[in-house]
A protein has these predicted regions:
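Conserved RecA-like ASCE ATPase "motif II neighborhood" in helicase/translocase motors
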Residues: 165-177
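Conserved P-loop
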Residues: 97-166
Length: 177
């Protein structure tokens, strides 16, 4: 835990000293003496900034989406503020949903034109191999793990096909990179 003096420096108006020796866009989680979460800050190269618990609303996902824990808060913040973000976590921790909600928010607000998704063309269990059966790249992609994830997150295949037709989502198999 940071000392009272360190916290005083971080929260002062002139907090331009990198007291935790952070890299640019590195986060610091601040807990109290009982190890309860208090705050999360990010070093922007000039000063520490508080990472607010933002709420995103998109046409694609409807209801406002808000982080459920500090790690999701940092993921949302990084996706909104950085050109590249890698999110890790166990299954069900919200990585895909947070990424898609943030990407759709950035598209709907005009900051991005489209989402480009590189996917592994390995099919899900008992689905056809990418190159062996007839069908478009999109049809084959929808049988892969990425297709199942997109259909689950967007609600149905029609919604995914619609975003692809509008050019808002582009699927590229890694074999074509």
């Amino acid at each position: 835990s940071p000392t009272d003096e360190e916290l005083s420096t971080v929260y002062s108006k002139d907090n331009c000293e990198n007291i935790f020796n952070c890299l640019i866009n590195e986060y610091v989680i601040i807990n109290d003496e009982n190890d309860n979460f208090c705050d999360v800050i990010r070093w922007n190269g000039v000063k520490y900034e508080t990472v607010w618990n933002k709420t995103l609303k998109t046409l694609a996902f409807g209801d406002k989406i808000k982080s459920k824990d500090v790690y999701q808060r940092m993921a949302f913040d990084s996706l909104l503020n950085n050109t590249m973000t890698c999110i890790t976590g166990h299954a069900g921790s919200g990585k895909s949903l947070i990424s898609l909600v943030t990407a759709m928010h950035l598209i709907e607000t005009g900051k991005y034109d489209k989402i480009v998704i590189l996917f592994n063309p390995c099919p899900v269990k008992e689905a056809s191999q990418m190159g062996y059966y007839q069908g478009s790249l999109i049809d084959k992609a929808m049988q892969s793990n990425i297709g199942n994830m997109l259909i689950t997150k967007f609600g149905d295949r029609f919604a995914v096909d619609n975003y692809i037709a509008q050019g808002k989502i582009k699927l590229i198999p890694m074999t074509e990179c």
